[in-house]
């Protein structure tokens, strides 16, 4: 044996300490992200406690600045009082599509997966891509075969609500890459039914 070789090998106790430290750092990161998301969700719940139900089945109050869907098991759609007419109908269809697709359940699950892998940038990239495609799918359902004028109104609504800050814990209408969403909507054509 070479002199000093025994002294250069890591001690079993020190390796254990490194793994414990890494596990503690990982757990702390997960806890911080989940507590932050839970706090945002609770803040939103408090904000809409005075919301009243509207004839179209949504909820509204003065504190609601942008359309969003909140809740996992019994999701509710919240709309600003100022949103009326054809843009409101399109936005409502967008939010109802989120509920029909199960997005209020799948988005928190994707977020949880990203939190568990918080140290990995690819996990966050995948989460952002999921959010983007989710919004595009709901946009497509909202405009369907709408004429150009209604499509322009809908795009204007996206731009209007994109300036409102992000709301963690909710499916907010203005989320996503705005320029990409608007460009996609302006080019979108509803696919023709497949003939067999």
Language-model regions: role of each:
Residues 1-196:
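Membrane-embedded and juxtamembrane structural elements of multi-pass membrane proteins
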């Amino acid at each position: 044996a070479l002199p000093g070789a025994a002294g250069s090998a890591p001690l079993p106790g020190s390796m254990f300490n490194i793994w414990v430290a890494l596990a503690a750092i990982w757990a702390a990161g997960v806890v911080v992200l989940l507590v932050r998301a839970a706090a945002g969700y609770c803040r939103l719940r408090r904000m809409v406690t005075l919301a009243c139900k509207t004839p179209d089945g949504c909820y509204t109050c003065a504190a609601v600045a942008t359309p969003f869907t909140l809740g996992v098991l019994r999701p509710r759609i919240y709309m600003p009082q100022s949103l009326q007419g054809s843009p409101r109908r399109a936005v409502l269809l967008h939010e109802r599509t989120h509920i029909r697709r199960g997005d209020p359940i799948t988005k928190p699950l994707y977020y949880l997966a990203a939190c568990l892998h918080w140290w990995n940038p690819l996990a966050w990239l995948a989460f952002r891509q999921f959010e983007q495609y989710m919004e595009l799918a709901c946009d497509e359902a909202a405009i369907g075969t709408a004429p150009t004028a209604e499509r322009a109104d809908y795009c204007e609504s996206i731009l209007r609500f994109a300036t409102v800050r992000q709301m963690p814990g909710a499916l907010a209408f203005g989320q996503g890459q705005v320029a990409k969403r608007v460009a996609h909507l302006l080019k979108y054509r509803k696919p023709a039914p497949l003939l067999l």
